[in-house]
């Protein structure tokens, strides 16, 4: 199927988040006479303590923070303990996307607390059902050149827009909200040059799976991965989101992309054209490590149980029976991902011994699936449609049956993560 058959960037509709106002626009970037790559430019622009020497400790100014409901409660309690009146970041957002099942009063009570805390401290608040934090944040608040830290490991997804986005602990987020720097060890910058064009049926997920096939789940530790090269022209901003998101599975500190025409087009499509600022590596900029990927040589890949690093060609897994298929996560959040599944299933019925679970990644994606006719195709085929949120990715429902294979578009398949102790994902 051609990659451009359906779009992957819906326009946002009003009401996705409730907060004090729009994110500020462009900010001036630091400049230097030395040729710098994108990661170095981001670090230099936010450096408030230390020097950019690999292995040394530095302090970075934090522009934005992200918390979700599984980690945000402790962050809000920490802010209360500090006696903070209002957050001191450019913006901070509290999302509710994890603990969505309400089998007793605990989760809804927690959501009410988070909403009141967001109002008290001056955060934006995104309520249950609005969607997964990472694609929603990219659409609503992400901007090239900014720093973002979040109490969620996949915060790094925002690197798709040319941001320095890092997943950290809750206390670090609370300190940043209070106006304190983020302290990190200067990482190595790993330049990954992309060339060629993606074949049909090969996607951005296969790019990061190829990295995992080569380097495993700890290959990026202590490093920022920066993608560059003429192959970037093949990747939309949402494609880049997939790759940056799964930098977490590589163990990377962060993943960054340049802010180029693809990012300009994306921000224009989501109604925030004024947030764009070009950010690209200087001519002659170098990297601590280098890698090359010829996109033309890639084939569809899959991570077998039970590690994201256990990557093989899909052909090697052909013929294996599955009893559950789950589509929708921060690692495939675009409209196109769902539309392709719907078009494959149009006029067909799901096998009676297979459950297809669909998690729209945002309220906007769900709305576009409805207006585009794709949701009807999925429902007619026998799919189960769930609310917008993390859901099965974190074992919040959708646990697979014992001894059966579950095929998922999610970023992780570590043992038991699905909610079934002896799972096969």
Features from the language model and the residues they span:
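Fe-S-dependent hydro-lyases/dehydratases of central metabolism
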Residues: 1-425
